[in-house]
Amino acid sequence: MKNKRDRLFFTLLFVPQAPQSSYDRRAELEVLLAIPSAQSACGMEITMTDRHPYYEFEKDTYEIDEFDCSSIFLFVGKERALLLDTGCGIGDLKGVIRKITDKPYIVIASHGHMDHIGGAGAFDELYINPADNYFLDVSFEKMLENRRNYADFIRKREDKYYPYSTENDMLCWEKKPKLLPLSDGQTFDLGRRIITAYSCPGHTPGEMVFIDSKTRYLFCADACNRNLLLMQSGDHTEGRYVSVEKAAKAMERIVSMKDQYDHVINSHHDYRGFGAPLADYVVDQALECMKKIVDGTAEIREIPDPLQLNATKTVAVYGDVFITYSKEGVYETR
């Protein structure tokens, strides 16, 4: 072939089509051969995908699906917008936001896991609970490796075609955003719409949840789900560990705020419909499950591990909720 572009075009034409694709094949090639935006391995520039599905499930309230890796939420007010989480950092998230609004926006992390802050390198500033700042201390190269590994795992687990490549659409950060402190009770006025942040340690030490005054939704990120993982692999002395006892108290406070919200939506739509809330009872069942772990009466069961292929894990179960924790991490250190 004459040059690198010819070779790339030939390669793209003969990429085998994955079965059960929900995307149009012609659109796939259009994305891969689109206008310049990122540097490819062969030296030519290609566009990063902005084909993230998104859905306006309430007025000016959008769930952006990062190809089943995580959900990103965008709230649009009269004066500005707020972006909750940045996913793993697949493709051109800024381009997706531009499709929805031209208003200036704030960027907030619900917590520090890489499937929620992986795209933060594209932004200048990031609000995050300081208790989770340490998640961003890893090198850019190691973070990129972790992000790509997670995205590849989701692709294998779901057995779907997604319109992105980890090589061209998941790039190393060029800079770290300025970290701004996010605290319990902090409010963000978007113009006739206020988002309030609340601390809810459990999944991570700095996990935050958010109540939207306009929709009366509680956005609980990873603080609550039918598949709840508690942060129990860290060192007690470094503040990187959350006991079940502490997580239960935090969840109990959020449950006590039910007069402020009507629906709950989390940051992965594995156990709910895309753009749809969690079942109303999930928060209550999660709290009850934690309480039973603490008092020693929880039902223990072995289930398939959704975060590993062909593996199982031991969990506590109550109703439709199962919680992953360690026996050593039930109680606060006295």
Question: Where in this protein do the model-derived segments appear?
Answer:
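Active-site HxH/HxHxD metal-binding segment of metal-dependent hydrolases
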Residues: 90-187, 226, 277-302
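Hydrophobic/aromatic beta-strand patches that form the interior of the parallel beta-sheet core
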Residues: 62, 106-108, 127, 180-182, ...
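Metallo-beta-lactamase
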Residues: 33, 37-44, 49-56, 81, 89, 131-201, ...
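Short glycine/proline-enriched coil/turn segments at helix->beta-strand junctions
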Residues: 78-79, 101-104, 120-125, 213-215, ...
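Intrinsically disordered, low-complexity segments enriched in serine/proline and basic residues
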Residues: 1, 5-15
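Accessory terminal helices/loops
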Residues: 13-14, 21-44, 249-334
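Conserved beta-strand hairpin/beta-sheet module of binuclear metal-dependent hydrolase folds
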Residues: 50-99, 210-225
